[in-house]
């Protein structure tokens, strides 16, 4: 018997997914894409399989801004166990070393946290998706190869101690793109002299979605099974442009912009801008230089 093919359709928008623990970000994307029957989709930066929380998924024309969301500010809550280091810097790895945990109070932890705030140099976990020689580090580590994880500069905006119940604590971290919370926790453990690893991690928000209304995969499936229109479950692409100044163009200039032509006007605001038609339809992203020259970068077909 021949099985009928599932018809995939064009969807344009952003799904604010509450990723469950135990699956990769790409697996979560593929499940959501299959449920929505969306032709084209992409995620905005990986969450570890252990982690839960906000994973913005972009579909259709919204995939053109996925890279911008990848580079945006993010916030996490991390549950930490002091006294033990692991191969993965989280609870999924094998134990490397166990050390006694000193007597700590909140003031002592708060006193060392500033060492991890600002522009800092951070060594990535060896079990990470960063690539060396075209291959993820975790693939090399799983084969037992010696992995020299890169040291990179990242930006940590804030770290707040939420709970301290030795040997456990909970941190709230706000940071820039590329920051590994596992590495932050590992480094905090070394500063405290006892080692540490993450036992749970939840991403609270990704700019510009600071108060996200997230959907779980189960809730998504239930809504679609109940007959909800897939478009009604997605945010419009324009919501992902909230962090950029808006530049409205008249019909003539907009037509030139859509063709990829450069436009000059000294009244244009310098920097990256989101370009709109006069009736509020996003046309793309552009960069305005100091001479007022608008250069199209990403064009939307909406």
From Swiss-Prot:
What are the boundaries of the signal sequence?
none
Q: Does the keyword tRNA processing apply?
A: yes
The family database entries (Gene3D superfamilies) matched by this protein are listed as: Pseudouridine synthase
Q: Which GO terms describe its molecular function?
A: RNA binding; tRNA pseudouridine(55) synthase activity
User: Active site: which residues?
Assistant: 48 (nucleophile)
Tell me its EC number(s), please. Answer: 5.4.99.25
The UniProt catalytic activity note for this protein reads:
uridine(55) in tRNA = pseudouridine(55) in tRNA
| GO process annotations (BP) | mRNA pseudouridine synthesis; tRNA pseudouridine synthesis
Broadest EC class assigned to this enzyme: isomerase
Q: What does this protein do?
A: Responsible for synthesis of pseudouridine from uracil-55 in the psi GC loop of transfer RNAs.
The family database entries (NCBIfam families) matched by this protein are listed as: TruB
Regarding protein family, the annotation reads: Belongs to the pseudouridine synthase TruB family. Type 1 subfamily.
Q: What is this protein called?
A: tRNA pseudouridine synthase B
Organism annotation: Xylella fastidiosa (strain 9a5c)
């Amino acid at each position: 018997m021949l099985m009928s093919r599932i018809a995939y359709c064009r969807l344009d928008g952003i799904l604010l997914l509450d990723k469950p623990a135990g699956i990769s970000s790409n697996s979560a994307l593929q499940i959501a894409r299959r449920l929505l029957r969306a032709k084209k989709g992409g995620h905005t930066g990986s969450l570890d399989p252990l982690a839960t929380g906000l994973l913005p998924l972009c579909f259709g024309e919204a995939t053109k801004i996925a890279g911008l969301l990848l580079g945006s500010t993010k916030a996490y809550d991390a549950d930490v166990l002091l006294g033990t280091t692991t191969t993965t810097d989280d609870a999924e790895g094998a134990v490397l070393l166990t050390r006694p945990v000193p007597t700590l109070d909140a003031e002592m932890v708060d006193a060392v946290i500033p060492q991890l705030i600002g522009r800092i140099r951070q060594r990535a976990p060896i079990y990470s998706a960063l690539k060396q020689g075209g291959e993820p580090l975790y693939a090399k580590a799983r084969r037992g190869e010696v992995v020299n994880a890169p040291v990179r500069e990242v930006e940590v905006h804030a770290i707040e101690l939420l709970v301290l119940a030795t040997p456990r604590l909970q941190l709230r971290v706000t940071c820039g793109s590329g920051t590994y919370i596992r590495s932050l926790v590992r480094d905090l453990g070394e500063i405290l002299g006892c080692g540490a690893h993450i036992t749970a991690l939840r991403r609270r928000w990704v700019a510009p979605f600071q108060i996200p209304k997230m959907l779980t995969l189960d809730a998504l499936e239930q809504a679609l099974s109940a007959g909800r229109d897939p478009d009604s479950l997605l945010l419009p692409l324009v919501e992902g442009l909230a962090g950029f100044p808006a530049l409205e163009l008249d019909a003539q200039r907009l037509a030139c912009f859509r063709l990829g032509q450069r436009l000059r006007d000294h009244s244009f605001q310098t920097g990256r801008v989101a370009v709109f038609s006069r009736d509020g339809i996003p046309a793309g992203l552009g960069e305005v230089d100091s001479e007022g020259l608008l250069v199209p970068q990403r064009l939307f077909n909406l």
